[in-house]
């Protein structure tokens, strides 16, 4: 593991920055994940949303056990409850420590329903065509993939893996909240100028210190950006949720200046027939 952690930057997988590589190789990030995020309203809200979608799919009478795909499964906060509802769930994560944490929390019955695969979200060619009924990528995990083409490539692979009419739930943080943060205007303008000068830097990219890691990477979206990415990848959006600033629920009067007011976005999209 240490030798893998020390891999030169030019040898990192597609869409993976040095900061993300350090993140997925940090054992403490995984072992402390549940306690660190305990009580976060978004993590309860998005889980309910996925389980609601799962319940709707089961009422369609598939005549078989439904299959879900958890993209960036972490410690299994959604995949384990889903498995306990009778679904078969495949959890993907680049962090081996996260996958180990899922196994440690799983009962024997859980392990009969769930699978764990170490995988890079920007390299999903392993997925079978039309094999998934419900896919989800939560807590802005898609934002950890660097580069528009890598993110769209991921979405296209998810689209390919879904059954016709299959559902995809995705969350991103909203870039517009930057302007309200201390120093946000200066940073926003500086990042925009950098995106014009540096081909490896996209407007919306952010690198910051996080839990002992010096260069955590995350791409922050606008509403239009995620809508375009989904549309370009073949998805039709059934439901668009603008979250309030704390991401605890839908934004009140969401039509009013959502770019500046929304904490993030959740999209429920569908693979067109």
Where do the language-model regions lie?
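Core SAM-dependent methyltransferase catalytic element
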Residues: 254-273
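A short acidic, Gly/Pro-enriched loop at the edge of an enzyme's catalytic core
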Residues: 126-135
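A short glycine-rich, Lys/Arg-flanked "PGG" loop and its adjoining helix->strand segment in the class I
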Residues: 152-164
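A short SAM/SAH-binding and catalytic strip from SAM-dependent methyltransferases
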Residues: 134-149
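Conserved class I S-adenosyl-L-methionine
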Residues: 2-72, 262
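Class I SAM-dependent methyltransferase SAM/SAH-binding core
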Residues: 77-123
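SAM-dependent methyltransferase
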Residues: 169-229, 239-247
